[in-house]
């Protein structure tokens, strides 16, 4: 178009009133014929809005006079614009065209932080996927081009992944994400609806082709498919091929995939619609699939789409704007039948070497999965052989029963051969005889494949060096570079030197009949033996190894490498790894050692040395070999448990070690196998030991083991063997050895995962531990019979069948069906327990209720005592009674947990203070009683004070109306679970007391097993991917994370669990024992199994540590008031739960509507709000709130709603599990039915139709029935009552003894106390509280803890009390104390002064004042940081820096 036309258009446009304020000019037009578009180039001083562009287009169309697409591109007049101005003012314009082409990049380009560094623009974003996409598509170049074209500026652009932005604003965005999903799926549903309408028959060209990807879009009218069948879960039957998930991107359109579902998430919108997200993998990658479920599909889809489903999915691949990655919006889901790997052989093998997730940080498959797979394969048995432990046995036992298969219980132990002397083949040689100390250098590690290149030797006689031997050897092969690097021996140095055939006879002549000595003799002597064998000769000389000699003589050395031993003894070793120098150094070590043994140990000859060494051998320093131990029968199980226990308790050093002599001692009932390449036999074959030596080693084993070649492929990489053929030769050698010795040889997999695909999980776990070869995973999967036959076909058909099938079956047939854990229960026994419990109960009950017991008491007592004694539970009660009595005797109250408070016998035997009888009065004088049996009173504590009408004495008020059935079941035959809260500072004393009760060796801490948690696994996965530069979908990260969870990391102990073995039994009939976390420095011994697996067989006592008894003990010490005498219905105390007025402060002053700060159970923000909502007026109300706050779906979305809407009140809502049974019985439901309904509801199982019908028949209101149906878990009333009793007693001290209350609270509970801040007063506290409250959901756990302390400190100041500053001489180490002017914080209340430092200062100040900061630091051994903290607080005011006096002070 002509320039005149352009000018005319410019004049017309500029006359428009809407545009005349803008400075712009059309510079040219471009006609794009292909798209029928007129591109208009505009130069402008200002940004153009969409409305302004629209007006310009109208003018152009009018001037042209025909219809055409008009595209406006404008650039800014940039005579002096900077890069920063481009980003700040014109960034939207820069990105406009890119976003048109790639809409998904809007989030990255417009909402990401941008940093300018010189000429470089850095765009940071939290989506690794999108950043990778941007860089792959070279979007950075496009941005750079636009900036150059429009602004004339040269720049660099980088789009950078920033992990810190990955979860930013996640919570705020989640709701929007769900709305976006809903919107997207509604569109999909509309499309489906349109597709389902009848359509005209289309031509074959228009029919929809389900080819896995349809990038050209999805034609609604062409969607025509097969009708639904029984495998159709959603939508229609899917025809056509699938594509790999890894090939899907945001441009894939409609795709069809198939795979395994490994996780599902269900989200319900506010409108009640269900969004199902499930994660699916085809093992090329994984992807999230989302679908918005219509009511008609909901039940069917949710019932079928679960973890483990194998299915086919068709839907649209689309970018999820919030997950920031591609997901599939599902239209169709079909169930598929997965073709699994099966063992189709007629005769099946048996796997005898299998690891589970209990092989710590090494294997990735649970025992249950392994046993299930073996059963699916049709195998008659499968062995479980974890590294050093047997912790998978309980799960394996359950799985064996479920799958009807025999499990062979075993372990892959760590053998320490404590039967190998220092001198092999030695007799009575004196230390003054001849010894030849030698060393060799070689081309590699294999005596079979590598060559000797140097021999150096020194001869000793009478303890002195008398001769030497030294020569290079021409290996006739090239010396590897790494050997030259190590030894400095080059090819030129050995070329032309004598060969080994020439050298070896001369060397052996030099040796004569001497004792051969070498450091790590197996290596050097192995090469000599191999070369002598090639010459048809054998080595007969005695051989001494200075490695075990050094371990024996110099036990302080952690490592005994030659250079380290030499350094320790002050012996020169200048050219380490040269044969001559190493031999001389070893000779000097031997000289020194001979002298030491003669002079200090009275050892003068080889025989005495061997005897003393073997009798005092330190197993913890011996080299280890793998060994398989299988239990043949029940005796074998017990002996195996003894071996595992000894390995962990007596011989643990980095690994649980098993001395060979101990295995021999406990060998009865066991089958011993030679294990893998780390076994003693395989190592010996690899080292080239003689046939005689191999037979001696093999004689210890019942069977020999060989494994697939690829299992040991790493030996080729390490240079130990030449190639795969040599690996086969090693297996052949073991097979031939077995045949010669008549020992079965078996082929095993050494399984560490189930299927080939699973190796990725082990790869990640090993990489996370720093293994450099983690990516070179051998195929340690569970092979079928045919797969194993193929692996060993090189042995020949007959031998192959023998090792794979016949011999594995033979070993399996040797094993009986055994029980690693017995089925029965074995309670401890105390002679006369039944009579003792009956007597103490009757004595106590008569002392309270009189000789003629009220009917309600007698009836309850008879029922409970009969159930307890007839079912054998008296001993459990007696144990609990003795523990509580011990604590009370020592001055510490005990709180009961759980439902033990529902047992009246527990109350009368002083196990619990909670009285489960109906509310009542009883006279302490004449024993008259009045019971309230109509349900009008929930707790006796709320009865008004009253005097006995018969004698005038003040009535005792008691009873909380808790049915006995909650604790022992309706028939009274449910095993009681007595949990007790002892003072945390007294807990260890009670634990020790259990040993007094039952005897040492019958009491063990309950063991736990710590596994890789999801968060840790996620960290392993992310680290693995980042280190390798791999970018995968979040769904794939999720899959990898799931695969890495549940793997054992460590062992531990339950905080209060004690397992008790009857004194006529022993622990090895149940499980092995060990130290927690294998800590050899503790005297604590735990069960080897997780306590859950044996808690049904042995008694578990829960002796827990708790703050409340500690608090009450300290309060009693400070005030002299016995907490047991405190009334439970003091009006002022009860008022605290609705108002702070009783504290002398208003809610406006305090900033809180209640006065429950710091009270156990009632001080949290959540419960404080419950108090505001419910306005409790009684002890019973507080019990209900305790129940409501501890249940799941009992308050929120349940009682809270029904109270708010007026259906019920706090008094009548369902709060604890016992409420249901009591209420239904008052409604005239049969007791058994009431109990059954209570049990179902408390476990979250809801109500049956029959239950609902019966309840309605008895006039139970609808809201009550609905409330029952919503409950997931309920708290027992006995537990709630016990908690509230403690809380009310502590609240009493808060009201009436404020100094004691705050002193105690901060001493016992305030771990995060910051004395520096809090001592500044209430204004400083208020300011910090406001700062922390402003953080909202971003507040950290530590900050939450500080906020709680600040709230209580602020309350204290408002009550007129104050804190004194920490004082170096007046403050205690760890306890707050009351002084005349206020409460003095301890030294450890300063952030930066730990408990140990504080205690050290207090101990040292007893010996006099500190004369300087230096004196304080040196005497108390505290750090400079502690000194600075004390100084900053003012504790060291006036104290000089050092001990030196200044002359010029």
UniProtKB/Swiss-Prot annotation:
GO cellular component terms given for this protein: cytoplasm
Cell compartments where the protein resides: Cytoplasm
PANTHER family listed in its UniProt record: DNA POLYMERASE III POLC-TYPE, DNA POLYMERASE III SUBUNIT ALPHA
This protein's UniProt keywords: Cytoplasm, DNA replication, DNA-directed DNA polymerase, Exonuclease, Hydrolase, Nuclease, Nucleotidyltransferase, Transferase
Region (Disordered): 194-231
EC number: 2.7.7.7
Predominant location category: cytoplasm
Record's compositionally biased regions (Basic and acidic residues): 197-208, 217-229
Recorded catalytic activity of this chain's protein: DNA(n) + a 2'-deoxyribonucleoside 5'-triphosphate = DNA(n+1) + diphosphate
Protein name: DNA polymerase III PolC-type
CDD domains, per database record: DEDDh, PHP_PolIIIA_POLC, polC_OBF
Disulfide cross-links: none
Family named by the database record: Belongs to the DNA polymerase type-C family. PolC subfamily.
Stored NCBIfam families: dnaq (TIGR00573), polC_Gram_pos (TIGR01405), PRK00448.1 (NF001688)
Any Pfam family: DNA_pol3_a_NII
Function: Required for replicative DNA synthesis. This DNA polymerase also exhibits 3' to 5' exonuclease activity.
Keyword Hydrolase among record annotations: yes
Biological process according to GO: DNA-templated DNA replication
Domain Exonuclease: 435-590
GO molecular function, one term: 3'-5' exonuclease activity
């Amino acid at each position: 178009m002509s320039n005149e036309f352009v000018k005319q258009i410019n004049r017309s446009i500029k006359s428009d009133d809407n545009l005349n304020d803008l400075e712009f000019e059309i510079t040219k037009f471009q006609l794009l014929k292909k798209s029928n578009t007129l591109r208009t180039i505009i130069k402008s001083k200002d940004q153009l809005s969409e409305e302004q562009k629209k007006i310009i287009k109208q003018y152009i169309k009018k001037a042209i006079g025909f219809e055409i697409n008009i595209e406006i591109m404008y650039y800014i007049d940039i005579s002096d614009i900077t890069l920063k101005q481009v980003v700040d003012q014109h960034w939207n314009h820069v990105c406009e065209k890119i976003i048109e082409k790639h809409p998904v990049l809007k989030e990255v380009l417009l909402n990401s932080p941008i940093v300018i560094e010189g000429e470089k623009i850095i765009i940071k974003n939290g989506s690794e996927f999108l950043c990778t996409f941007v860089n792959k598509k070279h979007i950075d170049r496009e941005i750079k081009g636009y900036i150059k074209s429009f602004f004339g500026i040269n720049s660099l652009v980088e789009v950078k992944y920033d992990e810190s932005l990955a979860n930013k604003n996640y919570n705020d965005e989640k709701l929007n994400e769900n709305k976006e999903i809903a919107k997207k799926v509604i569109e999909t549903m509309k499309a489906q609806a349109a597709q389902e309408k009848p359509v005209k028959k289309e031509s074959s060209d228009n029919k929809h082709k389900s080819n896995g990807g349809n990038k050209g879009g999805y034609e609604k009218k062409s969607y025509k498919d097969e009708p639904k069948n029984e495998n159709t879960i959603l939508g229609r039957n899917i025809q056509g091929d699938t594509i790999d998930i890894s090939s899907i991107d945001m441009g894939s359109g409609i795709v069809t995939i198939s795979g395994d579902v490994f996780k599902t998430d269900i989200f319900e919108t506010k409108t009640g619609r269900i969004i199902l997200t499930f994660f699916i993998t085809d093992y090329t990658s994984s992807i999230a699939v989302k679908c918005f479920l219509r009511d008609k599909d909901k039940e069917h889809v949710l019932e079928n789409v679960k973890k483990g489903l194998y299915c086919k999915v068709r839907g649209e691949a689309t970018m999820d704007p919030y997950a920031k990655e591609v997901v599939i919006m599902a239209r169709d889901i079909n169930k598929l039948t997965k073709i699994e790997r099966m063992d189709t052989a007629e005769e099946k093998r048996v796997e005898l070497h299998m690891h589970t997730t209990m092989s710590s940080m090494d294997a990735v498959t649970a025992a249950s999965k392994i046993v299930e797979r073996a059963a699916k394969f049709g195998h008659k048995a499968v062995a479980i052989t974890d590294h050093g432990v047997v912790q998978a046995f309980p799960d394996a036992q359950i799985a064996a029963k479920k799958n009807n298969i025999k499990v062979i219980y075993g372990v892959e132990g760590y053998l320490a051969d404590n039967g190998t002397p220092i001198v092999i083949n030695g007799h009575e040689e004196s230390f003054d005889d001849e010894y030849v100390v030698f060393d060799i250098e070689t081309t590699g590690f294999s005596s079979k494949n590598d060559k000797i290149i140097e021999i150096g030797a020194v001869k000793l006689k009478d303890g002195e060096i008398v001769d030497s031997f030294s020569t290079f050897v021409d290996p006739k092969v090239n010396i590897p570079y790494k050997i030259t690097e190590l030894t400095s021996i080059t090819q030129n140095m050995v070329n032309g030197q004598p060969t080994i055939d020439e050298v070896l006879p001369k060397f052996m002549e030099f040796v004569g009949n001497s004792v051969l000595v070498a450091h790590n003799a197996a290596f050097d002597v192995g090469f000599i033996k191999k070369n002598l064998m090639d010459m048809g000769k054998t080595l007969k000389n005695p051989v001494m190894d200075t490695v075990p000699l050094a371990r024996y003589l110099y036990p302080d050395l952690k490592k005994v490498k030659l250079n380290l031993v030499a350094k320790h003894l002050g012996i020169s070793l200048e050219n380490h790894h040269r044969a001559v120098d190493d031999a001389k150094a070893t000779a000097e070590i031997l000289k020194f050692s001979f002298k030491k043994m003669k002079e200090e140990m009275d050892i003068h000859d080889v025989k005495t040395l061997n005897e003393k060494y073997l009798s005092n051998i330190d197993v913890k320093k011996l080299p280890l070999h793998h060994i398989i131990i299988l239990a043949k029968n029940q005796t074998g199980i017990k002996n195996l448990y003894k071996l595992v226990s000894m390995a962990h308790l007596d011989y643990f050093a980095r690994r649980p070690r098993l001395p060979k002599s101990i295995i021999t001692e406990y060998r009865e009932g066991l089958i011993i196998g030679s294990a893998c390449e780390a076994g003693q036999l395989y190592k010996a074959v690899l080292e080239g030991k003689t046939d005689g030596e191999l037979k001696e080693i093999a004689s210890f084993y019942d069977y020999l083991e060989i494994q697939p070649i690829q299992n040991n492929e790493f030996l080729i990489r390490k240079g130990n063997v030449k190639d795969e053929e040599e690996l086969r030769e090693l297996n052949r050698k073991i097979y031939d050895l077995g045949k010669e010795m008549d020992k079965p040889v078996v082929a095993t997999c050494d399984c560490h995962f189930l299927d080939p695909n699973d190796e990725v999980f082990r790869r990640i776990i090993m990489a996370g531990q720093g293994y450099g070869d983690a990516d070179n995973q051998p195929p340690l999967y569970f092979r079928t019979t045919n797969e194993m036959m193929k692996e060993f076909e090189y042995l020949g058909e007959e031998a192959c069948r023998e090792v794979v099938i016949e011999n594995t079956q033979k070993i399996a047939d040797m094993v009986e069906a055994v029980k690693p854990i017995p089925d029965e229960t074995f309670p401890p026994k105390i002679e006369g327990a039944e009579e003792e419990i009956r007597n103490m109960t009757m004595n106590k009950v008569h002392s309270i209720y009189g000789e003629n017991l009220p009917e309600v008491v007698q009836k309850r007592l008879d029922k409970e005592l009969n159930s307890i004694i007839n079912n054998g539970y008296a001993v459990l009660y007696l144990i609990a009674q003795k523990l509580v009595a011990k604590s009370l005797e020592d001055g510490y109250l005990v709180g009961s947990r759980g439902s033990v408070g529902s047992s009246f016998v527990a109350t009368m035997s002083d196990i619990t203070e909670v009285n489960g009888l109906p509310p009542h009065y009883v006279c302490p004088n004449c024993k008259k009683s009045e019971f309230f049996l109509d349900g009008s009173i929930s707790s006796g504590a709320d009865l008004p004070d009253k005097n006995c009408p018969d004698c005038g004495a003040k009535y005792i008020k008691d009873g909380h109306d808790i049915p006995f059935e909650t604790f022992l079941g309706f028939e009274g035959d449910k095993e009681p679970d007595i949990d007790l809260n002892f003072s945390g500072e007294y807990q260890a004393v009670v634990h020790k007391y259990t040993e007094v009760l039952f005897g040492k060796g019958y009491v063990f801490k309950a063991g736990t097993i710590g596994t890789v948690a999801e968060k840790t696994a996620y960290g392993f996965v992310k680290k693995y991917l980042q280190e390798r530069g791999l970018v995968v979908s979040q769904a794939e990260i999720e899959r990898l994370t799931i695969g890495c969870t549940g793997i054992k990391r460590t062992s531990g102990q339950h905080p209060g669990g004690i397992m008790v073995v009857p004194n006529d039994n022993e622990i090895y009939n149940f499980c092995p024992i060990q130290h927690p976390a294998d800590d050899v420095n503790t005297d604590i011994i735990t069960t080897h199994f997780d306590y859950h697996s044996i808690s049904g067989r042995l008694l578990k006592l829960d002796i827990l540590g708790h703050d409340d008894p500690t608090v009450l003990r300290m309060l009693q010490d400070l005030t002299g008031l016995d907490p047991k005498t405190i009334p439970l219905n003091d009006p002022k105390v009860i008022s605290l739960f609705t108002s702070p007025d009783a504290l002398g402060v208003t809610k406006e002053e305090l900033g809180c509507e209640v006065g429950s700060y710091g009270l156990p159970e009632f001080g949290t923000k959540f419960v404080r709000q419950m108090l505001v909502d419910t306005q409790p007026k009684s002890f019973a109300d507080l019990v209900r709130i305790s129940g409501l706050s501890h249940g799941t779906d009992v308050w929120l979305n349940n009682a809270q709603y029904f109270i708010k809407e007026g259906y019920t009140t706090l008094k009548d809502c369902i709060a604890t599990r016992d409420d249901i049974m009591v209420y239904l019985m008052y409604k005239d439901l049969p007791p058994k039915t009431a109990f059954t309904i209570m049990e179902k509801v408390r476990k979250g199982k809801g109500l049956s139709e029959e239950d609902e019908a019966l309840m309605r028949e008895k006039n139970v209101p609808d809201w009550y029935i609905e409330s029952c149906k919503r409950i997931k878990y309920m708290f027992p009333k006995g537990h709630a009552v016990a908690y509230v009793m403690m809380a009310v007693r502590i609240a009493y001290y808060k009201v009436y003894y404020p100094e004691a209350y705050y002193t105690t609270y901060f001493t016992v509970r305030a771990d995060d106390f910051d004395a520096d801040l809090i001592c500044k007063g209430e204004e400083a506290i208020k300011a910090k509280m406001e700062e922390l409250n402003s953080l909202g959901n971003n507040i950290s756990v530590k900050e939450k803890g500080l906020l709680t302390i600040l709230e209580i400190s602020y309350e204290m100041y408002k009550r007129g009390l104050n804190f004194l500053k920490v004082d170096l001489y007046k403050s205690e180490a760890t306890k707050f104390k009351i002084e005349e002017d206020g409460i003095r914080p301890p030294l450890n209340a300063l952030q930066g002064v730990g408990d140990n430092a504080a205690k050290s200062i207090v101990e040292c100040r007893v010996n006099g004042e500190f004369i300087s900061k230096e004196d304080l630091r040196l005497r108390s051994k505290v750090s400079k940081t502690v000194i600075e903290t004390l100084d900053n607080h003012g504790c060291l005011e006036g104290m000089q820096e050092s001990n030196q006096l200044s002359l010029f002070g």
